[in-house]
C-alpha cells in the first residue's frame, strides 16, 4: 500500500531525505487532490486483467521505460534537479514503478495551498500513480538513487514540464476548478 504524508518542514540539504511527518495522508485524501493510486505485481502486470482493463479503458496507447540512476541517465545531476523543479504538465502523468523507489511531491490542498505545503508520496515497485494534468508536482529519488518506471501516455507522448508559475495555463485553470474550488 502506498505511503504518503504531509511535509511539514523542508529544511534539508538533500531532497532525497524522506521528510517524514506524523501527518499521514490517505488514499481518499490523495484522491481529493486528483491523485489516483493502483497496485499491480510489477513482474506479471502485462498478464493482469485489471491492469489491461485500466490501460484500455483510459486509452493508454503508448508506453516507454525510463531508468533513472547515475549509471543509466546521462547528465544525471542536472536531470534530477529538473525533475525536482515544481512544474505541471498538459497531460496526466502516469507512472508504474517497475523497480527501485522515489518520491512524488504534490501540492497539498488541505487549507495549506497558500502556505506551499507538500504531500510526499513514496513510490515503490508495483505502485502505479496517475497525477492529473495541471497539478503542481515534483519528483526525486530516495537515497537508493535508482528507479525504473513505465511511463504511460494517451496517444503521442508529450512530456513537457511547465515550471511554476503556470497558473494561467488552461490545464491549471481546469485543475483548480475541478479539485481546488470544489473543496473550498
Curated annotation (Swiss-Prot):
Binding-site list for Ni(2+): 87, 89, 93, 137
PANTHER family: ACIREDUCTONE DIOXYGENASE
InterPro entries for this protein: ARD, ARD_euk, RmlC-like_jellyroll, RmlC_Cupin_sf
Similarity comment: family membership: Belongs to the acireductone dioxygenase (ARD) family.
Any one cellular-component term (Gene Ontology): cytoplasm
EC number: 1.13.11.54, 1.13.11.53
Cofactor(s) this protein cannot do without: Fe(2+); Ni(2+)
Catalytic activity: 1,2-dihydroxy-5-(methylsulfanyl)pent-1-en-3-one + O2 = 4-methylsulfanyl-2-oxobutanoate + formate + 2 H(+); 1,2-dihydroxy-5-(methylsulfanyl)pent-1-en-3-one + O2 = 3-(methylsulfanyl)propanoate + CO + formate + 2 H(+)
GO molecular function: acireductone dioxygenase (Ni2+-requiring) activity; acireductone dioxygenase [iron(II)-requiring] activity; iron ion binding; nickel cation binding
GO biological process: L-methionine salvage from methylthioadenosine; methionine metabolic process
Role noted for this protein: Catalyzes 2 different reactions between oxygen and the acireductone 1,2-dihydroxy-3-keto-5-methylthiopentene (DHK-MTPene) depending upon the metal bound in the active site. Fe-containing acireductone dioxygenase (Fe-ARD) produces formate and 2-keto-4-methylthiobutyrate (KMTB), the alpha-ketoacid precursor of methionine in the methionine recycle pathway. Ni-containing acireductone dioxygenase (Ni-ARD) produces methylthiopropionate, carbon monoxide and formate, and does not lie on the methionine recycle pathway.
Keyword Transmembrane on entry: no
Pathway listed: Amino-acid biosynthesis; L-methionine biosynthesis via salvage pathway; L-methionine from S-methyl-5-thio-alpha-D-ribose 1-phosphate: step 5/6
A Pfam cross-reference name: ARD
Name of this protein: Acireductone dioxygenase
Subcellular location: Cytoplasm; Nucleus
Record keywords: Amino-acid biosynthesis, Cytoplasm, Dioxygenase, Iron, Metal-binding, Methionine biosynthesis, Nickel, Nucleus, Oxidoreductase
UniProt keyword rRNA-binding, yes or no: no
Record note on cofactor: Binds either 1 Fe or Ni cation per monomer. Iron-binding promotes an acireductone dioxygenase reaction producing 2-keto-4-methylthiobutyrate, while nickel-binding promotes an acireductone dioxygenase reaction producing 3-(methylsulfanyl)propanoate.
Residues reported to bind Fe(2+): 87, 89, 93, 137
Main location: cytoplasm
Entry superkingdom: Eukaryota
Amino acid at each position: 500500500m502506498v505511503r504518503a504524508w504531509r511535509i511539514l518542514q523542508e529544511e534539508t540539504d538533500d531532497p532525497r531525505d524522506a521528510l517524514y511527518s506524523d501527518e499521514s495522508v490517505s488514499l481518499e485524501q490523495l484522491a481529493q487532490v486528483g491523485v489516483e493510486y493502483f497496485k499491480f505485481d510489477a513482474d506479471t502486470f502485462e498478464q493482469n486483467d485489471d491492469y489491461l482493463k485500466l490501460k484500455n479503458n483510459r486509452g493508454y496507447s503508448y508506453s516507454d521505460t525510463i531508468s533513472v540512476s547515475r549509471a543509466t541517465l546521462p547528465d544525471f545531476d542536472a536531470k534530477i534537479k529538473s525533475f525536482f523543479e515544481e512544474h505541471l504538465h498538459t497531460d496526466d502523468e502516469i507512472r508504474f514503478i517497475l523497480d527501485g523507489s522515489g518520491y512524488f511531491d504534490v501540492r497539498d490542498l488541505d487549507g495549506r495551498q497558500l502556505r506551499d505545503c507538500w504531500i510526499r508520496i513514496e513510490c515503490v515497485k508495483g505502485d502505479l500513480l496517475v497525477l492529473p494534468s495541471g497539478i503542481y508536482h515534483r519528483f526525486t529519488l530516495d537515497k537508493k538513487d535508482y528507479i525504473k518506471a513505465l511511463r504511460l501516455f494517451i496517444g503521442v507522448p508529450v512530456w513537457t514540464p511547465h515550471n511554476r508559475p503556470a497558473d494561467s495555463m488552461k490545464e491549471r485553470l481546469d485543475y483548480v476548478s475541478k479539485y481546488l474550488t470544489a473543496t473550498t
